[in-house]
Amino acid sequence: NLYQFKNMIHCTVPSRPWWHFADYGCYCGRGGKGTPVDDLDRCCQVHDNCYEKAGKMGCWPYFTLYKYKCSQGKLTCSGGNSKCGAAVCNCDLVAANCFAGARYIDANYNINFKKRCQ
């Protein structure tokens, strides 16, 4: 769920507050549209697509609880998750790891969505 995703982000990117990822580019935060502005925004586009796929499996990604572990910046999804829990955990884990490897460009935070995301 979104609370767990926030905690996963904190695990892989402890140096930056999670809310910096909630209004970034064209895909991080609100619904996505247009061309991603950079690699970090592409992480969010992939995450959106992953949640969409989980939704088509009958899951509710924003609310699905799952079990995971964070140890020294490394995430693992627990083996005992339900089908939906495993799917959503994997979506969030992949995104949090992607965030850790992508450059954060301050100019792409809180952009003019209507102008830049067509």
UniProtKB/Swiss-Prot annotation:
The primary site where this protein sits is: secreted
Q: In which tissues is it expressed?
A: Expressed by the venom gland.
Question: What SMART domains does its record include?
Answer: PA2c
Which parts of the sequence bind Ca(2+)?
Y27, G29, G31, D48
Q: What is its EC number?
A: 3.1.1.4
Motif Coagulation factor Xa binding motif, chain ranges: 52-69
So which domain of life are we looking at? Eukaryota
Q: Which PROSITE patterns match?
A: PA2_ASP, PA2_HIS
GO cellular component terms listed in the entry, alphabetical order: extracellular region
Q: Which UniProt keywords apply?
A: Blood coagulation cascade inhibiting toxin, Calcium, Cytolysis, Disulfide bond, Hemolysis, Hemostasis impairing toxin, Hydrolase, Lipid degradation, Lipid metabolism, Metal-binding, Myotoxin, Neurotoxin, Secreted, Toxin
The cellular location(s) given in this protein's UniProt record come to:
Secreted
Active site (UniProt):
H47, D92
Q: Does the keyword Hydrolase apply?
A: yes
What this chain does, per the entry, is described as: Snake venom phospholipase A2 (PLA2) that shows several activities. It shows strong anticoagulant activity, probably by binding to coagulation factor Xa (F10) and inhibiting the formation of the prothrombinase complex, shows direct hemolytic action, causes neuromuscular blockade with a gradual contracture and a decreased sensitivity to ACh and KCl, abolishes twitches evoked by indirect stimulation earlier than those by direct stimulation (in the mouse phrenic nerve-diaphragm preparation), and causes myonecrosis when injected intramuscularly.
**Protein name per UniProt:** Basic phospholipase A2 CM-III
Q: Which organism is it from?
A: Naja mossambica
Name the lineage.
Eukaryota, Metazoa, Chordata, Craniata, Vertebrata
